[in-house]
């Protein structure tokens, strides 16, 4: 039986599990049915990745940590072993098996394997920002770090928007920024927000326990969904993106926190979500190998599809893909050596 560390927080693992299910659900729609929007994915995408990165930041923050040279190098080395080495191994295997090995595979999306690479970049950026701008852990230093994260997020957001217009003028920089998955840096603000919430968690709980605050957050998220044309107005697209991401993430986090008894190990679905949450890296790395690709011709499905009908179909497929991924992960983890280099296990 798997030994679960006592310091793990059940509802956090369950929330990660839900986020992982939504990622696989999205990939079922994208790779299996040829659409990024069916099955309400156009709504889910507003908070799916923001929630994932928020949790990553929340878990990464540690009160009292001093970013001296030894801590910085040790942490970056540790994250490199966990995030980059397994990703390189699985990505190369995937590219070879599916005959996709060419230079374009190492662009911003990396055939789907961008998440762990970008998360490593977030760790490095955050660590360096804290070490250089907030060594005394002051309010001023905290603001400086926030400004850096916000500017990076805005720059990446608008780079993605205007990429096709200016790509030809970037020359070599286009390839460098693609290799670094710079367009994905737009989510770094949610990673920072996770660290900020963890640092000020008591205040966060006090605010989100207020029914009026949660009502406003739900209203903001709903407004952006109901009036999507707001997103197309020049100059405020980023504000809408930020509000949707933050409100959606806070709503999800608060729901799991305030209903944590339902997501504990005392319930069957709580145990299931926590298991998925503890194995998000394994599932992420493996699931591309077992996704059902090209289930139907995209134009056929898009012509006759129905969102409500699609949801149970895609969820069943998503759970099946996750189950197979967990079984494969369990086989690999029999070997401590493979567990270390394939999944960053200690």
Task: Give, region by region, the residue ranges found by the protein language model.
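Alpha-helical transmembrane segments and their immediate juxtamembrane cytosolic regions
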Residues: 1-346
